[in-house]
Amino acid sequence: MKKIIQLITLFAISTQIFAQKLNIPIPNNPAVKVGTLKNGIKYYILKNTEPKNRMELRLVVNAGSVLETESQQGLAHFLEHMNFNGTKEFPKNELVNFLQKSGMKFGADLNASTSFDETIYQLQVPTDSAKLFERAFQILADWSNYATLDTAEINKERGIILEEERARGKNAQSRIQQKLLPILFNNSIYSKRLPIGKTDIIKSFPAEEIVKFYKDWYRPDLMAVVAVGDFDEAQVENLIKEKFSPIKSPKNAPKRTKYEIPASAGTQTYQILDKEIPQSTFQMFGRLPREKTTTQADYRTDIAENLFNQMISTRLQDASKKPNAPFVFGIMGYSPFLGGLDVFQTIVLPKNAEGMEDAIKAIIDEQERIKRFGFTKGELERAKKEYMVGVEKGFKEKDKTKSANFVNGFVQNYLQGSAFTNADFRYEFAQKQLEGITLDEVNAITKKVIKEENRVGLIVGSEKDKEKLPDEAKLKELLSYKNPDLKPLEEEVALTPILEKIPEGTKVVSEKKIDEIGVTELVFANGVKVALKPTNFKNDQIVFSASSKGGTSLYSDADYFSAELASTIISQGGVSKLSDTQLDKALAGKVAQVYTYVGELTEGLGGNTTPKDLETALQLMYAYVTQPRRDDEVVKNFLKNEKELLANSIKTLTPEKVFGDTVSTILYQNHFRRTPNKPEDIDK
């Protein structure tokens, strides 16, 4: 007994020491130059040469629609538009004209977005043009403080904004969103400040209102400049100081309030229907207090949560593949939200409206199974392997990372205070900490995030299915049910290798170099031609494809649909003696992605891998070609699901679908090989 007490004491002490070691800040990327001007504007500068002669710029404004007054609803978004309609250095439309003449395109190189809490302007600029390089920083400065907000231009823009709102209003997804968001925001200020605003205000607001919003919230202490690209860092810093230092902070500026979404008791249920929604879904949102990631202990918790998300997603994916599964697709995940919250989200697509209750029961059962019995050791080990693959890829490709991929880390640091690490830290930290994350730690996350408090359950579907779908009372009953007969997961593991016998291969009968394009062409004795081309686009990636002439054009009309669907069915059946689920488990921790296809004139396969996993990828390619696994249950399940999806798609017709189908019918004279598939085609 004394020894047991000593062991427990030793364990407790070691745990405290371990926690203390990680209770230190997460280190930011030391290559990033971070500074703050005297007026309060913060800036982030990182030299990165991928792509060469290009720079990513962002102006981040810590202000969005949530800060609007009652009479300003929609003006944060309106102001974003107005910044392209006249500034001090670029009157009226000269800004867009200047950038387009410089070879930049609106949307790809030049854009902006307004959300509830922030507004972000973006530019992608060539750095090999001295004039454009300097002008880019002037553009950001103009957006931040020198918008002209001319009354005539405001009146012109009203129609554009109203048309944008009208177009969204005619879109089913937008209509659903406008009903869904106030529910998720629980009648907080967020629910009353959707960025699109109110039509009557957009039509008639006086110019002084938008000027006031601009002066109140576009101010130095609420703005940051982000610059990442192929440039001289000192030159960029000098340009930021030159263009932004003259901006003055307003006197008596309003306080930037951080709003929160209040909690609600228990589970709330809703039914949101629309005439143009083709497929009904079940969605559930568990709202949880925001967890900030500031220390290395927090970062370790983030990794455990990443593993949790991987495992729970795989559970649902595997469940959807089972014979007679009540849902076609399902996802669950834990992630940041807004208003001081994180969210545990569930989305499920049942086979049809009649099967909605069964789909919900299956999802609730799976959540309860995980809470009751936890994950398995095998699930955790595979998730760790997959996580490490991603970290290793980032580490090996760190000098090939695109500038755009760095930007969001700096934006989130400014807005949320989250750290921006580099690939070296992420790799070293994972090597030290990943293996030590236990099943108990991950299972504790399950109990933390899967709760019935402050939860919203929704059925989003077609008005035509109203009578077939559970009403709000029935949905609440389904969500509260606890199945007493649940059992722990029985894993379907891979017991055999991809290939039980490795083929002998064949000889190379000819070799030819094509120096103009850097390709070596090999011809094998069996007639297969292989073209090899070394590249330096990536450090740790091999991309491959193979094709032959043929495709569905070789098949008779009677066999056309079988040929068209063949590759999809093959991809779901597995290879050799491995089911698709077993194959996924066998490939855990490996980068060996292979797809097959049957086109109109060709068929083939392709994918990507790494030098380390090339052997596995080649075996998988060979297995798909020579040993595709036919599983009658998989075929039956796939065809049934496909038929249901097609039936749902024609049951609820949207204007876009009707237009597209009509164009196809006219262009191709209603030929079944070129027009959208119908439910009855699956029976052929």
What are these regions (language model features)?
Residues 46, 51-68, 75-76, 93-142, ...:
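M16 family metallopeptidases and their MPP-like homologs
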Residues 1-21:
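Bacterial Sec-dependent N-terminal signal peptides
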Residues 98, 146-149, 154, 437, ...:
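Peptidyl-prolyl cis-trans isomerase
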Residues 19-42, 232-275, 279-289, 293-294, ...:
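Proteolytic maturation boundary segments
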Residues 150, 249-253, 372-380, 631:
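Flexible helix-coil linker/hinge segments at domain or subdomain boundaries
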Residues 145, 153, 158-166, 170-209, ...:
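Hydrophobic, small-residue-rich alpha-helical packing segments that form membrane-like cores
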Residues 82-90:
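Metal-associated gating/positioning segment near the N- to mid-region
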